[in-house]
């Protein structure tokens, strides 16, 4: 129970800041928070409320003589300091007399200081937003406007918190619901209102990392038989703790993701794409939760999960390492049994100290470098000699293959489909209808450790939960609050129609083709490791940055697509990359929206590169993915000047690897030409259409040594002056000389958009 009280107390340790900002009370936030929580009978627990009342040095000094030396508030105190990257001697409390706190200051953007050496520092902030279950968080982008948060905003939060906290208890079954409340209500509440500092860390991010650190310290002390928390964490010799490797930074890294999603064929390949992507997302979420369960930790200890990766903060104990070793063995056995070598999850960890997490020794970046090296080593030596021998003896010659994924094992009797593909096809029908997913002893999709997953209605899930305590429930993009109820998972899963044939049937004009977009954030790894200046690098800030990226791809993406009902299905949206299929015109149009909104969201501190392919509906999915991936790679290699040494990226490739353009060229050159062409060519008959094809042929033949084609071009344009006007004919001629490549692209898009179906 001590650990539960510590986690809940650490999560709620700064709740008094909301009370302070939303009322006229003049007391310190620690006192206000303690009084507020004690107004709920179920939270009247001294160990818990002390973590709220006494997490600053001044308050601790005044009561330590009357408190036990193993009081939990000492752990919350130091975890609070580590989370904020703050030296314990600079321990200021919001609401204290003599300091100039600005109650109305808005949450700043973490992108303000990102890559500031190259792109400068900004002063953007967020408008106030609180997300509830029934109201989806609106698109909330940082603005240069000096936003202010009024007392009324905070008063509204207090009302919402009272309603939710009445339904919660400080126990294991309610911790995740408490976290979800905090994420919904506190994501845009600044942790600090000190305008002399950066105010870009939300109260939610600071509080959850504080709880993660606190629970890890608790486990470390239990293993080391340390019982005098006052001496270890508060008295003068407490500085020694900051150098102890009390923590483990641990990660999961899934390999084979793209091949698993895309390397399928068969009549139902397109329909099962989303199911395969969703399955991998859920695998990583469930694996992370299962490990936390074994370690007796909460989801606060998940620093990031998404895109085939997860990062967790754990205690550096022999018990933790033993659990990790057993877990890794069991996990690998399951993946080998179900997927052979097609999918693999690497697990690695590295020991870290509080000073590492605070970057006081300049070693914070080294945590991720060491972790990356250990993960790479695991991937390079993923199987033992015995496992490889077993794999080599499992194959059978002339075996029937699965009609979808071409596997020759796990086939269902009397059917040419394997168990996994069959299950994915069954669940794919429910993915767009249901938002609740249950992991239990019985179900449809195989999950690790003897469990199965099913998509159910709310009433079905609720009934199952009441009858079986072992059931684990996840909700997709919906928050639920209650006892051991549901874990919210945000997913970029916008679906216009599950049937692509029906989707294309709705397009009345233009070539009947699917468009495929693959996009990736440029240099994201570099930004994560080196983008935040040393003075501001901390575990809370990197957690904030990671969550911001997830919010864009897993939450805002859905809203951007739904605003104009784009005929597009999101197949995969990770923490930094994207794969979508839809009507090709909608894919092309939305690509500009994606680029613009991502630039707005990151304040032009980050960019995105993309490849856009066009294919017939029956074209093999694996080839669609591969060829569009090649187009994306071409965009990543974009150089505005051939003499440039380094690629600038921030580009898009259209249909063919030779058609690589900067986003600015596509938006402000090609699309401008396309609009002019559409306006002037819209009344052309079939003879006029032939003129366009002739024009493209001539343009493709023009180069520095072919003046004859320039003459032919001028002659062809002169013959069309009567139909398109002399002015536009001259403009086409000028474009042909100055911007031939973009003119060809604009003409080709026009033909594709107006071609008979």
Predicted regions and their residues:
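Divalent metal-dependent catalytic cores for phosphoryl transfer on phosphate-bearing substrates
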Residues: 1-137, 142, 189-193, 242-243, ...
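Alpha-helical phosphate/pyrophosphate-handling elements in metalloenzyme active cores
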Residues: 1-5, 30-43, 201-237, 467-469, ...
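A short glycine-enriched loop-to-beta-strand structural element that forms part of the catalytic core
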Residues: 48-55, 248, 300-313, 340-358, ...
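Alpha-helical scaffold within the catalytic cores of cyclic-nucleotide enzymes
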Residues: 211-222, 278-297, 325-335, 547-567, ...
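Cyclic nucleotide signaling catalytic output domains
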Residues: 315, 326, 330, 349, ...
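Catalytic/regulatory signature loops of cyclic-dinucleotide turnover enzymes
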Residues: 334-345, 370-385, 601-605, 627-659
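Cys/His-rich short segments
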Residues: 379-463, 479
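Long, compositionally biased charged/polar accessory segments in the mid-to-C-terminal portions
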Residues: 641-757
